[in-house]
Curated annotation (Swiss-Prot):
GO biological process, one term: translation
Alphabetized InterPro entries for the sequence: Ribosomal_uS7, Ribosomal_uS7_bac/org-type, Ribosomal_uS7_CS, Ribosomal_uS7_dom, Ribosomal_uS7_dom_sf
Gene3D superfamilies: Ribosomal protein S7 domain
Family: Belongs to the universal ribosomal protein uS7 family.
MF (Gene Ontology): rRNA binding; structural constituent of ribosome; tRNA binding
Subunit structure: Part of the 30S ribosomal subunit. Contacts proteins S9 and S11.
Pfam families: Ribosomal_S7
GO cellular component: small ribosomal subunit
Function: One of the primary rRNA binding proteins, it binds directly to 16S rRNA where it nucleates assembly of the head domain of the 30S subunit. Is located at the subunit interface close to the decoding center, probably blocks exit of the E-site tRNA.
Keywords: Ribonucleoprotein, Ribosomal protein, RNA-binding, rRNA-binding, tRNA-binding
Protein name as it appears in the record: Small ribosomal subunit protein uS7
Gene: rpsG
Length: 156
């Protein structure tokens, strides 16, 4: 770790359409090679598709999907006397959000639909209904933490 001053958190602006900071973070995570306008059209297209199919507020459904994917506990490796233990630890809120965003995007990229808009809207709908690859990833993480509960006293 650096002994100098801590890096300041950068200020990000809320997205222009919904005025939501989390959607901006999501957009930045979808973005590849600095192409923000492409990422913006993908995310807004997916939210419009959700609104058309689910007939509900897309931002609320997006936040519901993020909450369903976000892990509450994870395992971290801890070396104790020559042995490496997988120690369950609570996930900080910022990391919880970042993991949920990353898992949703990776799950969407792994789907079979033709366009990224379709893949992302499908994964968001699945996550909002507690199914899909991203939710499975969260359940696997929780299962790992539960299996290693015996090592929770090694927490730091």
């Amino acid at each position: 770790m650096s002994r100098r001053h801590k890096a300041e958190k950068r200020e990000i602006n809320p997205d222009p359409k919904f005025g939501d900071l989390v959607i901006t973070k999501f957009m930045n995570a979808v973005m590849l090679h600095g192409k923000k306008s492409v990422a913006e059209s993908i995310v807004y297209g997916a939210l419009d598709a959700i609104e058309a199919t689910a007939k509900s507020e897309p931002v609320a459904l997006f936040h519901q999907a993020l909450d369903n994917v976000a892990p509450h506990i994870e395992v971290r490796s801890r070396r104790v006397g020559g042995a490496t233990y997988q120690v369950p630890v609570d996930v900080r809120p910022e990391r919880r959000q970042a993991l949920a965003i990353r898992w949703l995007i990776n799950a969407a990229r792994g789907r079979n639909e033709t366009t990224m808009v379709d893949r992302l809207s499908g994964e968001l709908l699945d996550a909002a209904n507690n199914r899909g690859s991203a939710v499975k990833k969260r359940e696997d993480t929780h299962r790992m933490a539960e299996a290693n509960r015996a090592f929770s006293h090694y927490r730091w």
